């Protein structure tokens, strides 16, 4: 009883000074193109960007500016309205836009210009497919692009060429259905699969090791649908799955489950 009273007295100042949060809703009635928001990014000028199932939205603090699929000959606009992901380039004034079936778009928000990267069967170094699930900054300043059907792409921003990492050229890679990756900065890529768990890909050797859920092992991956992978400031690898969160230990190759 005394310990509870002491805790209450310690928290009392915070409770007395706490103010209720004000939630401001910004939906289609406020100018948002669609209420299904799939990704958010902030550019270097401070503007917020929202990817939706029906267009790209820029928010300046008071209003939305919407970008839709380009229907004109001048090439201004996005290549598809159904979007999956956004990334503000860590180095350049470019917003990268991953679409569901219309390739990768790059919007230079200083020059107000769009550049498009689409699959071209006649060009081997083009993006391997137009279904982009995520765009991630590579440790060397370039990009990793994940796809739903054809594995992982490494994009060289200087040459505009894509290098392909998939089951056709990576021994041991369990699937080409990829949600996301994280660059470990140590020559390793941490891969989240749509249905087949988690992989560690050696970029130089082009080999992969896979991890899946084992119901009998509490140190295994919690679930096999890996939607997000994150390397924190202490180089820990966090894995978000459909059955909970896990912290991966690269030395023991075990997972600490949080669910």
Model features per residue range: what roles?
Residues 1-259:
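Carboxylate-rich, polar loop motifs that coordinate divalent cations or form catalytic acidic clusters
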